[in-house]
From Swiss-Prot:
Species this protein is from: Prochlorococcus marinus subsp. pastoris (strain CCMP1986 / NIES-2087 / MED4)
Pathway: Lipid metabolism; phospholipid metabolism
SUPFAM superfamilies per the UniProt record, alphabetical: Isocitrate/Isopropylmalate dehydrogenase-like
Main location: cytoplasm
Superkingdom as given in the UniProt entry: Bacteria
Protein name, entry field: Phosphate acyltransferase
Subcellular location(s) per record: Cytoplasm
Key words, A-Z: Cytoplasm, Lipid biosynthesis, Lipid metabolism, Phospholipid biosynthesis, Phospholipid metabolism, Transferase
Nucleus among keywords: no
GO BP annotations listed: fatty acid biosynthetic process; phospholipid biosynthetic process
GO MF annotations, alphabetized: phosphate:acyl-[acyl carrier protein] acyltransferase activity
Catalytic activity reported: a fatty acyl-[ACP] + phosphate = an acyl phosphate + holo-[ACP]
Described function: Catalyzes the reversible formation of acyl-phosphate (acyl-PO(4)) from acyl-[acyl-carrier-protein] (acyl-ACP). This enzyme utilizes acyl-ACP as fatty acyl donor, but not acyl-CoA.
Length: 466
């Protein structure tokens, strides 16, 4: 009986593994799970003794490996989930993570995540609008504290100090906050109220003590190398223009966002995604120049391919703005213009930079933000019903979540405001701590790669002086 039970378990395991191999893209993870499961099954055969204990022992062992055909459907699902979880933890050390990280390749050279303590003299100060965002200041502060421990940065946290301390104590962050203040890695800078999400951007001119203005002044006076805000993006743009000014020759700054592509190590920079809803051909030409510098410096692409978002590949396609912009980009010799980019090609990896007006870009951005959740829901609804579907769901759960993460805006953190005299990172209004950490990594990388130095070189180009 002992031998028969062991044979049945082994057969069940093999059937599950064969089914998974036919339906999963990550076959190396499955191989690891299968080896673990078969080994555990053999151990189970030696441990199980006595007819009366066969079923219970088999249930305990199989619950940690790959399946128990003796138990109910719920036990089968739990078993499959445990196998995938075990395999995933093993795979983390042997396979490249599937989560999209636009600056993943830069982490080694930047030393962003280092086990060695970086002295304060070598850390970069970043000003943070602690009051900007739907849920500020708690998730902003939590993200800043997390980023300080992971990256060689210090934070000037701008906000109403009394409120920041009260909220930190309420959520249990006060001890960590005081520790970082004592270590001179975080400084609280007092300010007035933030510019509300529903307020006009021009409010920054009247309220000089607004948190975004105070943060921007820190960059202006060189007390910080970059600024981050998850508040009113229009107010951030207005404050940047009024406080630190535009780059010489740039008519309008643009918001550049990194989108995932088929190659998770090579994202595409799309700009503008919301700063300028109405654009001239000269604006888009300048966006291409800005994006080209960013792709070279931060993304480390030697010869970025620039695309113009349009409804067709042909030169004659599109509206008046597209046709005139195409002509300007085609005549530009300082970058590699790859022609029109249709909507279906944005995430293909064929282009490194895609330019468009802010109205179109913002729609594209918001659409992409919804894709991850919708895709996951569709895949779940298409799985078979019953026992087989539940087992399949358990096997695919971790993979589906990784797909969702690759398309989740929280994983990307923020977008750069390009075209002003400083590094400004704009966060999503609903940013949580994970988004803040990602955005601060983006700010650090931009500073570390001397983006501003090279952007300032653009004014030497004839096109910006004409």
């Amino acid at each position: 009986m002992e031998k028969d039970s062991s044979i049945k378990k082994s057969r069940a395991i093999r059937r599950l593994v064969i089914w998974y191999k036919r339906n999963s893209a990550v076959t190396s993870i499955v191989d690891t799970a299968a080896n673990s499961a078969v080994t555990a099954s053999n151990v189970a055969g030696n441990v199980v003794s006595g007819a009366g204990s066969v079923v219970s022992t088999a249930s305990n062992v199989a619950g940690n490996v790959a399946g128990n055909v003796v138990s109910s459907a719920e036990s089968v699902v739990n078993t499959a989930s445990n196998v995938v979880s075990s395999a995933s933890s093993i795979a983390k050390n042997t396979l490249q993570p599937l989560v999209f990280d636009p600056l993943k390749r830069l982490q080694n050279s930047d030393n962003l995540i280092s086990k060695e303590e970086v002295p304060n003299s070598e850390r970069i100060w970043i000003a943070v609008d602690g009051m900007g965002g739907d849920y500020a200041p708690v998730p902003i502060l939590e993200g800043c504290l997390g980023a300080i421990s992971r990256f060689p940065i210090n934070i000037k946290f701008v906000g109403k100090i009394e409120k920041v301390r009260y909220e930190a104590e309420r959520v249990g962050l006060i001890d960590l906050l005081e520790k970082e203040i004592d270590n001179n890695r975080l400084e609280l800078i007092d300010s007035g109220d933030p510019i509300g999400m529903n307020e006009e951007a021009t409010a920054v001119r009247k309220r000089k003590d607004a948190s975004i203005n105070v943060a921007m002044d820190l960059v202006k006076t060189n007390k910080a190398k970059a600024v981050y805000s998850a508040g009113n993006s229009g107010a951030l743009m207005a404050s940047a223009i009024f406080r630190i000014g535009r780059l010489k020759g740039i008519e309008r700054p643009a918001i550049g966002a990194l989108f995932p592509t088929r190659d998770q190590t090579r994202p595409v920079l799309v700009l503008d995604v919301g700063a300028n809803t109405d654009c001239k051909p000269s604006y888009l030409h300048q966006f291409a120049l800005l994006g080209n510098v960013y792709a070279k410096d931060v993304l480390q692409i030697e010869k970025p391919r620039i695309g113009l978002l349009n409804i067709g590949e042909e030169e004659c396609k599109g509206n008046d703005l597209s046709i005139k912009t195409f002509e300007l980009l085609s005549n530009e010799k300082s970058f590699n213009f790859g022609g029109n980019c249709e909507g279906r090609d944005v995430l293909s990896g064929d282009f490194d930079v895609v330019v468009c007006d802010g109205f179109t870009g913002n729609i594209l951005l918001k659409f992409l933000e919804s894709v991850g959740g919708v895709l996951l829901d569709i895949l779940r609804s298409e799985l078979p019903r019953g026992r087989r579907g539940k087992v399949g769901s358990a096997f695919l759960k971790s993979n589906l979540l990784r797909i969702k993460k690759r398309l989740d805006h929280a994983e990307h953190g923020g977008a750069l405001l390009l075209g002003v005299n400083g590094i400004c990172v704009i966060g999503h209004g609903s940013s949580k701590s994970l988004s803040v950490v990602s955005a601060l990594r983006l700010a650090h990388s931009a500073v570390n790669h001397n983006v501003m130095e090279n952007l300032n070189q653009l004014q030497k180009l004839q096109v910006l002086n004409s």
